[in-house]
Amino acid sequence: MRVSSSLIALAALAVQALALPVNELAERDTGLDVKLIPIGNTRVKAIITNNADHEMSFVKYNTLFDSSPVRKVQISKDGSIVPFNGMRLYYDINNLPKEAYKTLAPGASAEAEFDIAETSDLSAGGSFEISAEGSIPVIDGQGTKPTGSIRFKANVLTMDIDGEMASKVASAIPELDKRTRVDGQTCTGQYAQLLQGGLRNCVTYAQRAAQAASGGNAQKFQEYFKTTSQQARQSVARRFQAIAQECSSANQGRTIYFCQDIYRNCQRGLIAYTIPARSHVVNCPDYWRLPPVVNRGLDPDHGYVVVHEFTHATSIFSPGTVDHAYGYEQCRRLNAQQSLSNADNYSLFAADVTRN
């Protein structure tokens, strides 16, 4: 991580915080139905229906109903997954604003349309398979925090795509002028000081997590990654070592860090996002509202978020992670394969072995 001279100031005094207990979130298979419909060469409509007998609100962020260029579907051609070129975002599941949710009465539906060519190169044309499955956090009734999550699996679409038409669809991620490793235009003043502190905190998290992964308590590793195999432990350790190196490098690195929303994709409740295809990491306004340092528990602080985002960056360690789940209670329900590829499992593990 290259840091311009304006960033070499001492970090602001860190605010210490204590984490609160995380609510238990139940997971179920019924309640929401998701259907995909092709409506154009590369355009898709998603319909979500509340099949429960009560009102339900679901999180829109990082789902088919997110207006940001997140991964809404998986695209494959001839058995191979088409690379995703959009953004991977981070939010604190226990502190989302009302607008992060969509409320549905019993039997009601909501629709969203999107163009899959905005975040994937489909210029090869031909037959593509489009699928979507995962888990959506929900609120049953009139609450303000998720009460559970619902697994879903939509129908699979087979779309015959005109490659020339697809190539004319504008990317959802605009090109930027070349920037320094830590962007000097957006990382100034207090932003620069706080980010410098977050990067130092990231080094501590990543170094201790690397040590714990390679030679620490096997039960603790099992808690977060659902395996104790040496191959998995060494792979996790290597990812953390690569992150520690990226966070500690003052003059060189593989990512570009923006302290403000240069792509204009932030929404209330979003903390940061990464564009792996560009090796760009962007902090949202809510990042700066987090405590710079949390000393106990598993709540996010600045360094926690940096670790989360850097696990997404394929330029730091490949393959990059995705976002199957957020928060301890959701992340611990993932299987081993999902846990090893989920960004928040890494941040949670790093926070646990460092703070507790």
Curated annotation (Swiss-Prot):
The gene is MEP5. Residues 1-19 form the signal peptide. It comes from Coccidioides posadasii (strain C735) (Valley fever fungus). Residues 20-179 form a propeptide. This is Neutral protease 2 homolog MEP5. It is found in: Secreted. Belongs to the peptidase M35 family. It is an enzyme of class 3 (hydrolase). The keyword Transcription regulation does not apply. Its cofactor is Zn(2+). GO terms for biological process: proteolysis. Disulfide bonds join 187-259, 266-284. Keywords: Cleavage on pair of basic residues, Disulfide bond, Hydrolase, Metal-binding, Metalloprotease, Protease, Secreted, Signal, Virulence, Zinc, Zymogen.
